[in-house]
């Protein structure tokens, strides 16, 4: 113990101490892809809209910032479809309860199922997020919105969130006049990151990328 204390003291003298400040530490929880559809939706119909979050929800909510990459749109009238060949996904608006219980602060929209029920349904889902105070990035009402960074500050640290989708298909990507995910473009992402750093808009830049179906 004495040797460790001596080592720590000498290390501090050599490096000039530490810049660690507990008051500025931020816990960021990023879950990866969420899709409340098919078998998950079936279980939610049986056990309630908060079922997926009953165990993990409080843990996620304890973070300073909680992020969900939500793969599918919220669609009024969405029906549970368990068919193995069904690849058109949606979630009932009531399923938002699981995200609320999980303390979700930010929604990543880099998935390729946002437009499965059409562009109008995708727009309605975006409006639903806004109505419930959930900011989105990596997707949006059009290409400009999809590529726009989302900024958030926690405990004195400024974060910038960006996202894009490499996999497609093309109807899943946002254009100048339709919603969707941001189509991966290294040039756009690189320029955006440079701009953020040059303008000192964030301390940490996080980029979410959906590659293939992962």
Language-model-detected regions and their locations in the chain:
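Acidic, metal/ion-coordinating pockets
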Residues: 2-214
């Amino acid at each position: 113990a004495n040797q460790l204390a001596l080592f720590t003291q000498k290390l501090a003298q050599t490096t000039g101490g530490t810049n660690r400040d507990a008051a500025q530490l931020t816990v960021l929880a990023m879950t990866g892809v969420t899709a409340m559809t098919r078998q998950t939706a079936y279980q939610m119909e049986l056990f309630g809209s908060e079922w997926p979050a009953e165990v993990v929800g409080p843990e996620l909510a304890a973070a300073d910032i909680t992020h969900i990459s939500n793969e599918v749109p919220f669609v009024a009238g969405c029906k549970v479809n368990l068919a193995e060949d069904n690849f058109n996904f949606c979630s009932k608006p009531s399923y938002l309860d699981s995200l609320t219980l999980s303390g979700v602060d930010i929604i990543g929209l880099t998935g390729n199922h946002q437009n499965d029920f059409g562009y109008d349904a995708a727009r309605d889902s975006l409006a639903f997020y806004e109505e419930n105070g959930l900011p989105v990035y990596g997707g949006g009402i059009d290409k400009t919105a999809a590529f726009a960074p989302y900024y958030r500050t926690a405990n004195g640290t400024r974060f910038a969130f960006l996202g894009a989708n490499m996999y497609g298909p093309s109807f899943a990507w946002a254009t100048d006049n339709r919603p969707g995910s941001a189509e991966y473009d290294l040039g756009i992402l690189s320029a955006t990151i440079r701009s953020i750093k040059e303008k000192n808009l964030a301390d940490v830049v996080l980029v979410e990328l959906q590659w293939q179906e992962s």
